[in-house]
Amino acid sequence: VINDNTEINRVYSFFNAIRGNNTPNEYQRVLAVLKKVMEIQECAQNELDYDELYELMLSVATDFDIPNPFPEKDRFIDVYRTLQGFEKLSWTDVLEYGDVKSKFRVPESVVDEMEKNFIEGFQEVLIPEAEKFSPFLERLVDTHYDSHFTLTTMDAFYYRVLTEMFDGNEMVDIKQTNIYQYEFTSEKYDLILSVPVFGIRDKVCENSEFICRDYDMIAVENLALHLKSEGILSIVLPARITFAGGNVRELREFLQSMYCLKEISDLPSGIFDNTGVKTLLFTITTGRTDEVTIKKFVFENEDARKTGNKKLLVQDDTFVLEDELSDMGDWNVNRIFESQDEDWIKFQESNVKKQELGAVASIFRGKAVNRKDLNGSIGVVNISNIGEYEIDYSNLDHFEEENRKIANYILQTGDLLIPARGTAIRIAIFEEQSYPCIASSNVIVIRATDESLSTTYLKLFFDSPLGRKMLVTRQQGTAVMNISYKELNNIEIPLPSIEEQRSIAEEYTRELKVYKKAIQEAENRWNSTLAKLQARI
């Protein structure tokens, strides 16, 4: 890919020359046709005249399965003349040209991590949907020149461009095939690098032969089938593979029974452009390993999203025995780190009574409200109403509904409210108002069902470093917070005597009042001082 600034400016001029009446989606294809025409002209024994070049262009466009990009011959001749003065572009430049937002590309930092799975000597390597790796394909092939690469794509145009890119290289095969279909190839490979489609709602047809119907889940199952003995699959998957139930749980169990997990790496949010889906990099092998390496990556640069510098640093790493991972029932990276956290270990080794939250409380999501009514008799507590210490009742939404439809959602004094999604975890205790209230569907309600639990004490615990870590580990796979209310049932909380809880809760409530009073007095004094000073101006 061209890096020199002077050449980049020339390239932009090159691109501008081909635009004309073509749409942005056509630029890349037009550029490919022109590049191929220029290559053929360079290799021709005799220089072709403009009529011959135009006929050649039509032939190349047909080969690329592209409609005639230059219906007007004169327009083609003008563009061709313009391009003759420019240096040759690579096929990588052709692949990378176009609307960045419309392309999905694997960042170099992720490619670098995947590349660590190469070994010295010959390997059969498969890179499906290779256009996603296009900026780095030539580098990978050149660096690992003694390995044989199979690059696949589902797109006919990309198939042709990749074929041109590696024309004459006997160590590279290009195939047009679909990795989301059974038996997409009969070959097996030593190493497979893949970033499948994820974050879309479309699923394959119900009569699919795979465990799951999601494209990303199909990819990991299907690609793993094509590993040789001691083969390795390095694949990026959305975080839901680590926690989801149903067919996804069945897929996890299948992968652990048939293969070995070698490494699970948590990737930072924003590593891939144009998606908010939380992702992890998995290393799966047909070889044997007793330990699974667990890593958590962060960006080297805090402003990575703005600067585009997405270099990765290992923030934390550990390992877990494969049998222990199987016993966990999921692949929750945060929970693995939590179990090895000093605060967690101290808690587990303490003599304090411990109890699963679901045994002493009912946990449920609020109700979706579609129609607001300023004069409605029922209040709705939204995420925005939940403060760090209390609920802002003055700005509640209201609506009207039949009692029977909301009876199970009416909030009671002492209910603990937690945002189910958003950017921050804030916890507050509800107090009954003069009108009935419910929580919105984005709010989780925890209600004590046993006299052994004080929800004020529970709030204080969840606000503690250990309690906050427990909540974070129940977060599901998106870039923004998304806590599963069902997962909260399994949280193990410290449960001292109710007398001790009440003592802690009473002191908390008393000191909170003192704190709020002091804050209010300080604000009043400050506002008064400002008013006096401004009056003297």
Model-derived features: where do they sit?
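Conserved Class I SAM-dependent methyltransferase catalytic core
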Residues: C212-V277, L281-T283
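Long recognition/docking surfaces used for binding and targeting
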Residues: E26-K101
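A short beta-sheet element
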Residues: A407-Y409, T413-F462
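Non-catalytic DNA-recognition/assembly elements of restriction-modification systems
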Residues: F319-D373, S497-I537
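Sequence-specific dsDNA recognition surfaces
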Residues: Q355-V369, S384-T413
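Flexible, glycine-/basic-rich loop-and-beta segments that form/coincide
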Residues: N274-K353
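Conserved S-adenosyl-L-methionine
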Residues: Y97-S194, G199-R201, P238-A239
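A short glycine-rich beta-alpha junction/loop motif
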Residues: F282, P436-I444, Q476-R502
